[in-house]
Amino acid sequence: HRPRVEILWDAGADLILFETCPSLEEAKVEAGIAEGMGIPYWISFSCQDGGHTCEGTPIEECMKEFEQREKYPNLQMVGVNCTHPQYITELIRRMKSITSLPVAVYPNSGEIYDPVTKTWHGDFVSGRYEQWALEWMEAGASAVGGCCRTVAKHIEEVSHAREKFLNR
């Protein structure tokens, strides 16, 4: 990862986002690169359910590691991406119970990927992503967006959720 980070940083990046981390070990390696370079960064995990990274580590364990601010002083935010939206609220709650860092979430569209047929299944339900996004903001997410299979309509719904959240 280091050569890519150096290229991005030298090109003028404001921070480096290490995303879709399937494991705590990979995230620690990536954090070590950024800390070694003395640059600001985010770490975002991909999760298999409402409590575990894709390789199975409890998300609380990941947060405990990165809550060591003396070890990770350049870490600006932690997050979850490339994960089904139904798991995000619980993940935010678990993360916020441990970390003082801001939490970012940008899940997939809600469709399900079939690795055998290499196809996505499910339909976009108007308004559902907005409901989820509002839930995520209420649970404490500081940044909300979209990952795989999200389109402009999803982000429009995030914007509507933000308006509702700010006008409460």
Segments and roles (model prediction):
Residues 1-168:
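Domain-level signal for soluble alpha/beta catalytic cores
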